[in-house]
Amino acid sequence: MEKPSSGANHVAKATVSLSIASVLILGAVLTMLSIQLDEAHERLQNRMGSFKFVARNIWHDIVLVKSNGRIKRQYGGYGSDSAQSDNQQCTSCVQLRCPPGPIGPPGVSGEPGMDGANGRPGKPGLDGLDVPLDPEPAFPCVICPAGPPGTRGPQGEVGRPGQTGESGHPGLPGRPGKPGRVGDAGPQGEPGEQGEPGIKGPPGDDSIGGTGIKGPPGPPGPRGPKGPPGSNGLPSQNSGPPGPIGEMGPPGPPGPRGEPGPPGPFGPPGDSGEPGGHCPSSCGVQEIVAPSVSELDTNDEPEKPARGGYSGGGYGKK
């Protein structure tokens, strides 16, 4: 227990010794500075006296020159001025109008002066008056009107694609088309039945004997029956030309419902809306009772409102 106390004593003694030494050194430095300042002040006073003496002699010389006189200057120290004071009297003084010299450089800033004494304390003021606070008036319940609509809010995310809708009702029959162009001539028909023999005509003229000219070919006869199929042809490596395009068949039945497509990309964010207004009121919270979004069944067909009002699943205010 004695070791810590002895160490603290040594530290305290060293601190006191350093403090005393610092005070002594500071006192010695201040004394030396004061002596040096006194010596500098004395030298400055001596130089100022010499300067005034030289300036006075120069002034006397200027006065003598202006008065057409001249005197021999004698610089014999401070005592020579009294010996020549009678000869240097100005008999006809002339007022000199010398131009002012240039402005000298600014002097060294002086030391700040001592702080002034504190002013007299002011008179005490009047006592304040107690102002009773009026109780807040009980305002009636006022429902503030809705504020102006804000600006358009940010663009929401792209919703999921809806389900495929049911097929629509069959459309109305179309208008009759325009008459087409005249078709090509059809094939020649079959010869008609043989007619009854006619009345015997009058006898003809006598013919000249000989061989007559061959007459024109008669009309083609009727189409004969289908012949038997011929023998198979020789195999060929080249395929024949494509056949003609057949007529379009009737439309087929509707196909099965396809799978829902992938979700679309997110849309760009919209403009920020204006901040909504605020109406402080102590009438409770105005609530809107409506079914939750999670409770709505998007798969079922929405009910059609009854005639003269809304369906039972509408909105209501509380």
UniProtKB/Swiss-Prot annotation:
Residues 309-318 have a biased composition (Gly residues). GO terms for biological process: cuticle development involved in collagen and cuticulin-based cuticle molting cycle; post-embryonic body morphogenesis. Residues 216-228, 250-268 have a biased composition (Pro residues). One of its GO terms (cellular component) is cuticular extracellular matrix. One of its GO terms (molecular function) is structural constituent of collagen and cuticulin-based cuticle. Residues 101-318 are annotated as: Disordered. This is Cuticle collagen dpy-7. It comes from Caenorhabditis elegans.
